[in-house]
UniProtKB/Swiss-Prot annotation:
Protein known as: 3-ketoacyl-CoA thiolase
Native source species: Shewanella frigidimarina (strain NCIMB 400)
Domain of life: Bacteria
Function: Catalyzes the final step of fatty acid oxidation in which acetyl-CoA is released and the CoA ester of a fatty acid two carbons shorter is formed.
Top-level class of the enzyme under EC nomenclature: transferase
Family from the record: Belongs to the thiolase-like superfamily. Thiolase family.
Amino acid sequence: MSDRQQVTNSRGERIAIVAGLRTPFAKQATAFHGVSALDMGKMVVNELLSRSEIDPQLIEQLVYGQVVQMPAAPNIAREIVLGTGMNVSTDAYSVTRACATSFQSAVNVAESIMTGNIEIGLAGGSDSSSVLPIGVSKKLAHALVDLNKARTFKQKFAIARRLGLKDLMPVPPAVAEYSTGLSMGQTAEQMAKTYNISRADQDALAHRSHTLATETWNSGHLRNEVMTAHIPPYKQFIDRDNNIRENSVLESYAKLRPAFDRKHGTVTAANSTPLTDGASAIILMSEGRAKALGYQPIGYIKSYAFTAIDVWQDMLMGPSYATPLALKRAGMELEDLTLIEMHEAFAAQTLANMQMFGSKKFAEEKLGRNRAIGEIDMSKFNVLGGSLAYGHPFAATGTRLITQVCNELKRRGGGTGLATACAAGGLGAAMILEVE
């Protein structure tokens, strides 16, 4: 069996990405305070349909995701269909794969096109860290169920007496890995210690990310892939990511205290992504359908891969596992790539993966390869800045990366690019994109 992945339909047509768009990304409780993931999803999908000038009735499938689930609307994809101009009969379902969620939604639509079930689909993801599902304690939840079934005042009073004051306190969503109890920041600290990632190197990468993102915004490169978002009640708007330190000074990063290991740690708020609100989406078509409708694709999916590792130690190594598999399926090596775009959840996580890309020992022991994935050429790496600067609405990051890579390759006259990300649960995602 060939190792090559055939990302085509039965007619041999490639899977085309014809358009991509996102909202500006905003830090928690700022511009999108009070705006749900669903509302941001509808916002970006409506604008993408308008800008692309596609008839919404032609969209045959919508796959959309969120990580911080909304109990009131668990199938965010279907609600987006009902809240936009698409046909109510449009197939729509929701996915979640932690920080790789919109990689998954894009692949699901691509695979539907590959099988011939559809010709046109829309994929993306949205997350809000400002509109959160606040829970209750287990004891209160148990009591509420019992109260609902109690018939007499005496029964209800007996149930209420079981509760203490602390049982009535709201419970915010967990920021920890369910299986281990470790937060993502604690995992980043693990990785910094395992791979001897210094505080200085982490701060330098964060400074680089903010500096490049500032230059990218000032150059106008993001103008066509980031919409202006008008915030209900429509008295204000946001048209630019608000996490970017536009006057980043490297020396200032050293002033912050470690956030997760106060005594010996190196991971700080400045070299980590903040909690972020935002949404993104892309339109995919078969190559033939795109040409028939007069679209010039911004890129094509050449290969993709998803991987998983154990969650107890250094679980954010996903790019180091998914990338070689995606490259193998594309028939390529790392040095063949024009651009490399890696999600920067934390500077420590990013630097650890970069280090392992160049490690023959890691390749032999963990990947079963006789050569390293390859040393990363920094002139190709996150050339527009990364998530440390732009922010990270969990489910929206994948399709941001895909759109950004395709547009930058187009500006450079074409080539191939890697988009890759780590994700909670020890997951990894990688996608090879080609642009003519």
